[in-house]
Protein backbone atom coordinates (compact mmCIF):
# COMPACT_ATOMS: atom_id res chain seq x y z
CA UNK A 1 0.00 0.00 0.00
CA UNK A 2 2.76 2.47 0.99
CA UNK A 3 4.69 1.70 -2.19
CA UNK A 4 1.54 2.29 -4.28
CA UNK A 5 0.98 5.69 -2.64
CA UNK A 6 4.61 6.67 -3.23
CA UNK A 7 4.29 5.72 -6.90
CA UNK A 8 1.13 7.80 -7.22
CA UNK A 9 2.81 10.81 -5.63
CA UNK A 10 5.44 10.68 -8.36
CA UNK A 11 2.88 10.73 -11.17
CA UNK A 12 1.23 13.68 -12.88
CA UNK A 13 -2.49 13.90 -13.58
CA UNK A 14 -4.93 15.83 -15.74
CA UNK A 15 -8.46 16.17 -14.35
CA UNK A 16 -11.46 16.67 -16.64
CA UNK A 17 -12.90 19.55 -14.66
CA UNK A 18 -16.28 21.03 -15.55
CA UNK A 19 -16.91 22.92 -12.32
CA UNK A 20 -19.63 20.49 -11.20
CA UNK A 21 -19.96 18.42 -8.05
CA UNK A 22 -18.46 15.26 -9.51
CA UNK A 23 -15.43 16.84 -11.15
CA UNK A 24 -14.75 19.01 -8.09
CA UNK A 25 -14.70 15.88 -5.94
CA UNK A 26 -12.48 14.13 -8.48
CA UNK A 27 -10.09 17.08 -8.46
CA UNK A 28 -9.77 16.85 -4.67
CA UNK A 29 -9.25 13.09 -5.01
CA UNK A 30 -6.43 13.64 -7.52
CA UNK A 31 -4.78 16.35 -5.43
CA UNK A 32 -4.59 13.88 -2.54
CA UNK A 33 -2.76 11.36 -4.72
CA UNK A 34 -0.56 12.91 -7.35
CA UNK A 35 2.54 15.08 -7.32
CA UNK A 36 1.21 17.51 -9.91
CA UNK A 37 -2.35 18.03 -11.13
CA UNK A 38 -3.63 20.16 -14.00
CA UNK A 39 -7.23 20.77 -15.02
CA UNK A 40 -9.02 20.74 -18.36
CA UNK A 41 -12.43 22.16 -19.21
CA UNK A 42 -14.44 22.36 -22.42
CA UNK A 43 -16.65 25.04 -23.89
CA UNK A 44 -19.00 23.06 -26.12
CA UNK A 45 -21.90 25.49 -26.28
CA UNK A 46 -23.56 24.05 -23.18
CA UNK A 47 -26.72 25.75 -21.92
CA UNK A 48 -25.32 25.76 -18.41
CA UNK A 49 -22.39 27.96 -19.38
CA UNK A 50 -22.32 29.21 -15.82
CA UNK A 51 -20.28 26.10 -15.07
CA UNK A 52 -17.38 27.73 -16.93
CA UNK A 53 -17.46 30.53 -14.35
CA UNK A 54 -17.85 27.99 -11.55
CA UNK A 55 -14.62 26.31 -12.63
CA UNK A 56 -12.60 29.42 -11.90
CA UNK A 57 -14.30 30.05 -8.56
CA UNK A 58 -13.70 26.48 -7.39
CA UNK A 59 -10.04 26.62 -8.43
CA UNK A 60 -9.60 29.90 -6.58
CA UNK A 61 -11.28 28.55 -3.45
CA UNK A 62 -9.22 25.36 -3.53
CA UNK A 63 -6.00 27.36 -3.68
CA UNK A 64 -7.13 29.63 -0.85
CA UNK A 65 -8.46 26.99 1.54
CA UNK A 66 -6.23 23.97 0.95
CA UNK A 67 -2.56 25.06 0.93
CA UNK A 68 -1.19 21.52 0.53
CA UNK A 69 -3.35 20.96 -2.52
CA UNK A 70 -2.50 24.41 -3.86
CA UNK A 71 1.16 23.40 -4.09
CA UNK A 72 0.25 20.51 -6.38
CA UNK A 73 -2.35 22.32 -8.48
CA UNK A 74 -0.91 23.43 -11.79
CA UNK A 75 -2.22 25.07 -14.94
CA UNK A 76 -5.85 25.17 -16.00
CA UNK A 77 -6.75 24.61 -19.67
CA UNK A 78 -9.96 25.38 -21.58
CA UNK A 79 -10.67 24.05 -25.07
CA UNK A 80 -13.28 25.34 -27.50
CA UNK A 81 -15.48 22.47 -28.71
CA UNK A 82 -18.33 24.39 -30.28
CA UNK A 83 -18.52 21.72 -32.96
CA UNK A 84 -20.32 19.44 -30.47
CA UNK A 85 -23.31 21.78 -30.53
CA UNK A 86 -23.34 21.52 -34.33
CA UNK A 87 -23.26 17.74 -34.58
CA UNK A 88 -25.30 16.89 -31.47
CA UNK A 89 -28.55 18.85 -31.32
CA UNK A 90 -29.44 18.08 -27.70
CA UNK A 91 -31.09 19.68 -24.69
CA UNK A 92 -27.61 20.29 -23.32
CA UNK A 93 -26.72 22.64 -26.16
CA UNK A 94 -30.05 24.12 -27.23
CA UNK A 95 -33.12 25.57 -25.53
CA UNK A 96 -35.28 22.45 -25.55
CA UNK A 97 -37.37 20.72 -22.94
CA UNK A 98 -35.55 17.86 -21.26
CA UNK A 99 -37.29 14.57 -22.04
CA UNK A 100 -36.68 10.89 -22.68
CA UNK A 101 -36.05 9.68 -26.23
CA UNK A 102 -37.26 6.54 -27.96
CA UNK A 103 -33.86 4.89 -27.38
CA UNK A 104 -34.28 5.17 -23.60
CA UNK A 105 -31.75 7.97 -23.18
CA UNK A 106 -32.62 11.51 -22.14
CA UNK A 107 -32.11 14.17 -24.80
CA UNK A 108 -29.34 15.64 -22.63
CA UNK A 109 -27.05 12.92 -24.00
CA UNK A 110 -24.40 14.53 -26.24
CA UNK A 111 -23.18 11.72 -28.54
CA UNK A 112 -19.44 11.18 -28.32
CA UNK A 113 -18.87 13.90 -25.74
CA UNK A 114 -16.85 11.92 -23.21
CA UNK A 115 -15.05 10.03 -25.96
CA UNK A 116 -13.90 13.31 -27.46
CA UNK A 117 -13.09 14.80 -24.04
CA UNK A 118 -10.83 11.88 -23.16
CA UNK A 119 -9.12 11.86 -26.55
CA UNK A 120 -8.27 15.54 -26.31
CA UNK A 121 -7.24 15.15 -22.67
CA UNK A 122 -4.86 12.35 -23.64
CA UNK A 123 -3.37 14.47 -26.42
CA UNK A 124 -2.85 17.40 -24.04
CA UNK A 125 -1.49 15.07 -21.38
CA UNK A 126 0.97 13.62 -23.89
CA UNK A 127 2.36 17.08 -24.60
CA UNK A 128 2.54 18.07 -20.92
CA UNK A 129 3.78 14.73 -19.52
CA UNK A 130 0.53 14.03 -17.66
CA UNK A 131 0.01 10.28 -17.90
CA UNK A 132 -3.04 9.96 -15.63
CA UNK A 133 -6.46 11.22 -16.75
CA UNK A 134 -9.14 11.61 -14.08
CA UNK A 135 -12.84 11.83 -14.94
CA UNK A 136 -16.11 11.88 -13.02
CA UNK A 137 -17.92 9.24 -15.08
CA UNK A 138 -19.98 6.74 -13.11
CA UNK A 139 -22.37 3.83 -13.64
CA UNK A 140 -24.50 4.24 -10.52
CA UNK A 141 -26.45 7.50 -10.24
CA UNK A 142 -26.37 8.48 -13.91
CA UNK A 143 -28.74 8.89 -16.83
CA UNK A 144 -27.67 5.81 -18.76
CA UNK A 145 -25.13 7.58 -20.98
CA UNK A 146 -23.14 4.84 -22.75
CA UNK A 147 -19.94 6.90 -22.67
CA UNK A 148 -20.05 6.89 -18.85
CA UNK A 149 -19.85 3.11 -18.56
CA UNK A 150 -16.83 1.37 -17.11
CA UNK A 151 -16.32 -0.87 -20.13
CA UNK A 152 -16.34 2.19 -22.41
CA UNK A 153 -13.68 3.92 -20.32
CA UNK A 154 -11.48 0.83 -20.07
CA UNK A 155 -11.73 0.28 -23.81
CA UNK A 156 -10.76 3.87 -24.53
CA UNK A 157 -7.81 3.64 -22.15
CA UNK A 158 -6.44 0.77 -24.22
CA UNK A 159 -7.12 2.58 -27.50
CA UNK A 160 -5.46 5.80 -26.35
CA UNK A 161 -2.41 3.96 -25.07
CA UNK A 162 -2.01 2.18 -28.40
CA UNK A 163 -2.65 5.30 -30.44
CA UNK A 164 -0.18 7.43 -28.50
CA UNK A 165 2.40 4.70 -28.01
CA UNK A 166 2.67 5.36 -24.29
CA UNK A 167 1.05 4.48 -21.00
CA UNK A 168 -2.30 6.18 -20.44
CA UNK A 169 -4.21 5.60 -17.21
CA UNK A 170 -7.83 6.73 -16.90
CA UNK A 171 -9.01 6.94 -13.30
CA UNK A 172 -12.74 7.18 -12.52
CA UNK A 173 -12.99 7.41 -8.71
CA UNK A 174 -16.78 7.80 -8.79
CA UNK A 175 -17.50 4.90 -11.15
CA UNK A 176 -19.17 2.70 -8.53
CA UNK A 177 -20.32 5.43 -6.12
CA UNK A 178 -23.82 6.84 -5.93
CA UNK A 179 -24.39 10.54 -5.23
CA UNK A 180 -24.71 10.01 -1.49
CA UNK A 181 -21.32 8.31 -1.52
CA UNK A 182 -19.90 11.15 -3.61
CA UNK A 183 -20.92 13.62 -0.90
CA UNK A 184 -19.33 11.29 1.64
CA UNK A 185 -16.11 11.14 -0.38
CA UNK A 186 -15.89 14.94 -0.50
CA UNK A 187 -16.31 15.04 3.27
CA UNK A 188 -13.63 12.41 3.73
CA UNK A 189 -11.19 14.22 1.45
CA UNK A 190 -11.61 17.81 2.60
CA UNK A 191 -14.03 17.84 5.51
CA UNK A 192 -16.75 20.43 5.90
CA UNK A 193 -14.67 23.01 4.05
CA UNK A 194 -14.79 20.97 0.85
CA UNK A 195 -18.45 20.06 1.30
CA UNK A 196 -19.29 23.75 1.71
CA UNK A 197 -17.26 24.57 -1.39
CA UNK A 198 -19.19 22.02 -3.42
CA UNK A 199 -22.48 23.43 -2.15
CA UNK A 200 -21.68 27.09 -2.70
CA UNK A 201 -19.47 27.14 -5.76
CA UNK A 202 -19.82 24.01 -7.92
CA UNK A 203 -22.55 23.93 -10.55
CA UNK A 204 -24.66 20.96 -11.66
CA UNK A 205 -28.01 22.25 -12.96
CA UNK A 206 -28.54 21.60 -16.67
CA UNK A 207 -30.59 24.79 -16.98
CA UNK A 208 -27.83 26.98 -15.56
CA UNK A 209 -29.98 28.18 -12.66
CA UNK A 210 -28.00 30.06 -9.98
CA UNK A 211 -30.85 32.07 -8.47
CA UNK A 212 -32.34 29.30 -6.33
CA UNK A 213 -30.34 28.19 -3.28
CA UNK A 214 -31.04 24.80 -1.70
CA UNK A 215 -29.35 22.91 1.12
CA UNK A 216 -27.37 21.00 -1.51
CA UNK A 217 -26.44 24.01 -3.65
CA UNK A 218 -27.86 26.06 -6.50
CA UNK A 219 -30.13 24.85 -9.29
CA UNK A 220 -33.64 24.59 -10.67
CA UNK A 221 -34.32 21.59 -8.42
CA UNK A 222 -36.10 19.49 -11.04
CA UNK A 223 -33.79 18.74 -13.98
CA UNK A 224 -32.13 15.28 -13.93
CA UNK A 225 -28.82 16.68 -12.66
CA UNK A 226 -30.47 18.59 -9.82
CA UNK A 227 -32.59 15.58 -8.89
CA UNK A 228 -29.53 13.35 -8.57
CA UNK A 229 -27.63 15.92 -6.54
CA UNK A 230 -30.59 16.63 -4.25
CA UNK A 231 -31.42 12.98 -3.64
CA UNK A 232 -27.79 12.14 -2.98
CA UNK A 233 -27.50 14.98 -0.49
CA UNK A 234 -30.64 13.92 1.37
CA UNK A 235 -29.52 10.29 1.57
CA UNK A 236 -26.04 11.30 2.75
CA UNK A 237 -27.37 13.67 5.41
CA UNK A 238 -29.88 11.07 6.59
CA UNK A 239 -27.14 8.44 6.78
CA UNK A 240 -24.80 10.75 8.68
CA UNK A 241 -27.56 11.64 11.14
CA UNK A 242 -28.34 7.95 11.65
CA UNK A 243 -24.65 7.20 12.27
CA UNK A 244 -24.52 9.93 14.93
Swiss-Prot record:
Mind telling me which CDD domains this protein's record contains? QueC-like
Q: Give the record's GO biological process terms.
A: queuosine biosynthetic process
Q: Which cofactor does it need?
A: Zn(2+)
Name the enzyme group at the top EC level: ligase
| Cofactor binding, note field | Binds 1 zinc ion per subunit.
**InterPro entries per the record?**
QueC, Rossmann-like_a/b/a_fold
Name this polypeptide is given:
7-cyano-7-deazaguanine synthase
Amino acid sequence: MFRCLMQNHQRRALVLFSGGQDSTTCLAWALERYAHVETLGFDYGQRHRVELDARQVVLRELRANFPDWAQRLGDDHLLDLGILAQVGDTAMTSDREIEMQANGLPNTFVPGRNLLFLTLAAALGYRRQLDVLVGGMCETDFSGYPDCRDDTIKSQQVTLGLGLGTRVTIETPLMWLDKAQTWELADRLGGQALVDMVIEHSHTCYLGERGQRHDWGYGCGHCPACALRKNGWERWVAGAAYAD
